[in-house]
A protein has these predicted regions:
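Beta/alpha (TIM)-barrel catalytic core signal, keyed to glycine-rich beta->alpha loops juxtaposed to Asp/Glu
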Residues: 1-155, 159-162
């Protein structure tokens, strides 16, 4: 279809980073849409993002707010996420110490990655979009290693119903 100019790009949307390797082994894709957020370094540490960029594959990041969880106050976060209270404490302290909002940190992290071509966000109204655009400008402070997690129960929202 690409050769016939019926389509310009072939892409996939994945939910789990493990799906990506199998897709790349079997298909010639132009872009991948994937979950990416400030707590999750798996794609960075595995060099998967670099490999995608080197292959000329566009990366579109979604769920940069971890389905809104990163933006919730401690009072509004559902109790089932309390098992990560240590991580939430580190997150909150880092935000306070660096005088940055959760929105600013989450969006700036995603757009600061040179391997990421586009960042997709969902909004309910124009004001939210304006707020995200404004938050995207500015410096992202260094992120401490203790703020990263590989806990798939937290990082993959499809696991949240079992919590």
């Amino acid at each position: 279809l690409k050769q016939k100019k019926k389509i310009e790009k072939i892409g996939v949307s994945i939910y789990d980073h493990n799906q990506l390797q199998a897709i790349l082994e079997n298909f010639d894709i132009d872009l991948v849409q994937l979950p990416f957020n400030i707590l999750d370094r798996r794609l960075i540490d595995s060099s998967m993002l670099s490999m995608l960029k080197n292959k000329g594959i566009e990366v579109h990041a979604r769920s940069v707010f971890l389905q809104g969880l990163l933006l919730m106050s401690e009072q509004n976060r559902p109790d089932k996420f309390n098992r990560w209270s240590g991580l939430w404490r580190i997150w909150r302290e880092w935000l306070n110490d660096n005088q940055i909002t959760a929105l600013e940190a989450a969006i700036r992290h995603a757009i600061s990655m040179p391997e990421i071509s586009k960042v997709l966000v969902g909004v309910d109204n124009v004001d939210q979009l304006k707020e995200i655009v404004t938050a995207s400008s500015g410096v992202l402070p260094n992120i401490p290693d203790e703020m990263f997690t590989n806990d798939i129960d937290l990082l993959n929202p499809s696991n949240w119903s079992a919590l």
